[in-house]
Amino acid sequence: MEKDYSEEVKAIIKTYNKENIVFGKDIDLLLKRVEASKEQIEEEIMSCNSLSFVKKQVKDNEIRYALFFIYGKKKGRQYVITFRNRELRIITVFTLGKKTLKKYSKKGLNI
């Protein structure tokens, strides 16, 4: 079973403001993909409500965190973020469906 980095990420996020959030990809593409507004995404990340699991990734000489927000058995969202130059950078956002959530729970993630 993988280690959960939720508490570490929550502590880091508390040091940031909404003004420090930057999107790594085209914001319109990400908003359309998850059918949410920019304010909703910012509020969700800053509050960390529904955050159930955080996975740490080392890629391209930087530390990335995959944040899994679960809203029920059928719905969820995954954010991939990094902290760079006093900015919280949202690299990408995915929606998680029923099959994906079921697959992750079978893998042993406590989602």
Predicted region positions:
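Ribonuclease/tRNase effector modules and their secretory precursors
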Residues: 1-111
